[in-house]
Amino acid sequence: MDPQGQLRNLRDFLLVYNRMTEICFHRCSSNFNYRNLTMDEERCVDSCAGKLIRTNHRLMGTYVQLMPAMVQKRMQEMESKAAEMAKAEAEAAAKAGTSVPDNPSSAITNASMMSPSIQDIPNTSSTAPNGFQILSSPDNTSDIKTSSMTNGSAFGETNLHVITNDAKTFTNQSLDELITPSPVNTSVPETPTAGGAGQTPS
């Protein structure tokens, strides 16, 4: 039963209880102010009080029997409300977390527009000294090897020509030194004497 229906039932019960009490006591006496009750009035009041006490006992017994079921029902209602709130929060978080555009192609297009273009990168290919050319595409290793071998052969021919000229010069100089006779030393060495060093014998 909904809370509004429970309140209506409780209100109706209290109205009936109050009306029954008024009828019972008014039947005993119309005025209870500042006077003592007679014997008949006392017996009537005692009868009405007994009826109210028995009614209250039955009401409390019924409440004790229904109280566990009422508490269980309230707990289930609270748990269901908490589960609904948690589910609503989870759905809201999922919607907030999955706020990604539905079209993946548009996302890829935006990402490509944000990333720097490959054409904007400057060309780093240049010509190094001594004829060694750095190619812009290092993947073609055959071209690099061919260029290196060609430049190396030209460099080797130049060095070989210089070495050949140096060898010829060295050969001519060595022949001139061999042909030119070296001076022969014909002087007699001096013999030291007792008279003093550096005197020749007579």
Swiss-Prot record:
Role, per record: Component of the TIM22 complex, a complex that mediates the import and insertion of multi-pass transmembrane proteins into the mitochondrial inner membrane. The TIM22 complex forms a twin-pore translocase that uses the membrane potential as the external driving force.
Region span, Disordered: 178-202
The species this protein was found in: Danio rerio
Family: Belongs to the small Tim family.
Keywords annotated in UniProt: Disulfide bond, Membrane, Metal-binding, Mitochondrion, Mitochondrion inner membrane, Protein transport, Translocation, Transport, Zinc
Subunit structure: Component of the TIM22 complex.
PANTHER family: MITOCHONDRIAL IMPORT INNER MEMBRANE TRANSLOCASE SUBUNIT TIM9B (PTHR13172)
Name of the molecule in the record: Mitochondrial import inner membrane translocase subunit Tim10 B
Keyword Disulfide bond among UniProt keywords: yes
Any one GO molecular-function label of the UniProt entry: metal ion binding
Motif Twin CX3C motif: chain residues: 24-48
Membrane topology: Peripheral membrane protein
GO cellular component: mitochondrial intermembrane space protein transporter complex; TIM22 mitochondrial import inner membrane insertion complex
Entry remark concerning the domains of this protein: The twin CX3C motif contains 4 conserved Cys residues that form 2 disulfide bonds in the mitochondrial intermembrane space. However, during the transit of timm10b from cytoplasm into mitochondrion, the Cys residues probably coordinate zinc, thereby preventing folding and allowing its transfer across mitochondrial outer membrane.
Matches recorded under InterPro entries: Mito_inner_translocase_sub, Tim10-like, Tim10-like_dom_sf
Gene Ontology biological-process entries: protein transport
Subcellular location: Mitochondrion inner membrane
Disulfide bond sites: C24-C48, C28-C44
